[in-house]
């Protein structure tokens, strides 16, 4: 992975902090010997003229899983919409992150490729209000955990029914105009409360989950224009 990323790290356009290129890892607590892997990558980065790497993790479940060492990372991403849902639902912040972690391991060991939840299928597509989600996102205040600084995350939309059909869920009332309004407020919050000038956006091209900034036939470049305007 490091050797693949190295040409990008050396590109002058690649984001870096104090001569440490950014390296984002999704659900790092699933990686065996994570500490040794990051130590090796840091060593390799220094051998290639950098002062190390800036490590960032992203995963709602990872954020609330206390069983792994977040101190290996410089930043964590408030990976919305999952993060805000777990933040305001204390019941899901206990066993759920660990279940997410170990259920993947169990499925891998047993060779299970799909999991079926008949109850969810019978309930049909879930619907959530876009405005309500954003109001909660704007209430978030970063908490430094193990020295890890948090990065806020904006959400364009969510609809994972293309992937999960009846078992999926989607936001209602999402528009580019609302996204622009809420994104502007998130920028203000970032300046006031967060120890970073970065904001992550869900997402660039998660078409199967309804979160994307890429232009489409319905809204054209409206979401990209919203960010540009802010």
Q: Positions of the model-derived regions?
A:
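Extracellular zinc-dependent metalloprotease catalytic-domain scaffold
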Residues: 2-8, 12, 28-47, 53-56, ...
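Alpha-helical scaffold elements lining the catalytic groove of polysaccharide deacetylases
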Residues: 1-7, 37, 130, 167-182
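Carbohydrate-binding surfaces of carbohydrate-active enzymes
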Residues: 224-230
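The substrate-binding groove and active-site-proximal loops of carbohydrate-active enzymes
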Residues: 21-32, 119-132, 167-177, 209-216
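Aromatic-lined glycan-binding groove of carbohydrate-active enzymes
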Residues: 40-173
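Loop/turn elements at helix/coil->beta-strand transitions in domains of secreted/extracellular proteins
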Residues: 20-22, 50-53, 146-149, 194-199
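Substrate-binding cleft of secreted/luminal carbohydrate-active enzymes
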Residues: 174-215
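Active-site groove signature of glycoside hydrolases
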Residues: 2-31, 197-206
